[in-house]
C-alpha cells in the first residue's frame, strides 16, 4: 500500500512538472540551441551543451511548479486546469514549494560549472521564472515576461560560450520575446472566456478582435529579427530557407486561428515547436 501511495505521489509530481507535456520545454530549448550555435559558432562545447539542455528541462519543470502554485486558487474554476495536482489535492502546497526549491538547486549546481558572468545572469533567470506566474494578476502583458523568461537562456548561452553579449544576442532575445507573445496569445485564446470570468489577464484579452492581426505582425517581426541575426553572422542559404519554411508555418497558424476555435488555437500553439526546430536546423546546417 505504501508503494502505491508513493507511486501516486510521483505521478502527481510528474504531472505538476509537465514532464508528460514536453511542448513547453521544447519552446524553451530551441532558442537556447539557436544561441549556442551562433555564439560558438557551430557545435558548442559538449559540456556547455549538456548543461544547457539539462537546465532547460529542470527550469521548465520549476517554472511549471511555481506557475501552478501561483494559480492554485484559480485553476479549480477553469475546466482545462481543474484536475491539476494542486487544485485537486494530489500535491500539497508544501510539497510544491519543496519540489520547486529542489529543481532550482539542481539547476544552480549545473550553472556553477560555468563562468562567473553566466552564474550572475542565472540570478535574473530565476527572478523571471518566479515573477512571471504572478504577472497575469496585474497586467495584460504577462506573455512579455514569459518571453523574457523563456529567452533569458540566450544571453546566458552567449555568456557561457564567448563571455560576451553582442548585438546578435539581443536581436535573438527580442525575437524570442515577440515569438513567445505570439504563441502564448494563441494558447491564451483557448482559455479566454474562462480567464475573463475569473479575472486573469492576458494578451488574448487585451488584443480582443485584433488578436490575429497582432499575432501576424509579431510573427513578421520575428522573421525580420532572425533574418538580421543571419545577416550579422554571415549565415548561408540553408538558414534563409529555414526562415522561408518558418514563414509558411506561421501562415498555417494564421489559418488555424482564423475562426478562433479553441482546439485549432491550441493546434496553432503546438505548431510553434516546428518553427523552433526548423530555425535550429537552418542554423546548424549553415555551420556545417
Curated annotation (Swiss-Prot):
The keyword Transmembrane applies. Its cofactor is Mg(2+). GO terms for biological process: ubiquinone biosynthetic process. The keyword Coiled coil does not apply. The chain crosses the membrane at residues 33-53, 99-119, 163-183, 213-233, 234-254, 268-288. PROSITE patterns: UBIA (PS00943). Keywords: Cell inner membrane, Cell membrane, Magnesium, Membrane, Transferase, Transmembrane, Transmembrane helix, Ubiquinone biosynthesis. Gene3D superfamilies: UbiA prenyltransferase (1.20.120.1780). GO terms for molecular function: 4-hydroxybenzoate polyprenyltransferase activity. It is a multi-pass membrane protein. Its EC number is 2.5.1.39. Pathway: Cofactor biosynthesis; ubiquinone biosynthesis. It catalyses: all-trans-octaprenyl diphosphate + 4-hydroxybenzoate = 4-hydroxy-3-(all-trans-octaprenyl)benzoate + diphosphate. GO terms for cellular component: plasma membrane. It is found in: Cell inner membrane. Belongs to the UbiA prenyltransferase family. PANTHER family: 4-HYDROXYBENZOATE POLYPRENYLTRANSFERASE, MITOCHONDRIAL, PRENYLTRANSFERASES. Catalyzes the prenylation of para-hydroxybenzoate (PHB) with an all-trans polyprenyl group. Mediates the second step in the final reaction sequence of ubiquinone-8 (UQ-8) biosynthesis, which is the condensation of the polyisoprenoid side chain with PHB, generating the first membrane-bound Q intermediate 3-octaprenyl-4-hydroxybenzoate. This is 4-hydroxybenzoate octaprenyltransferase. The gene is ubiA.
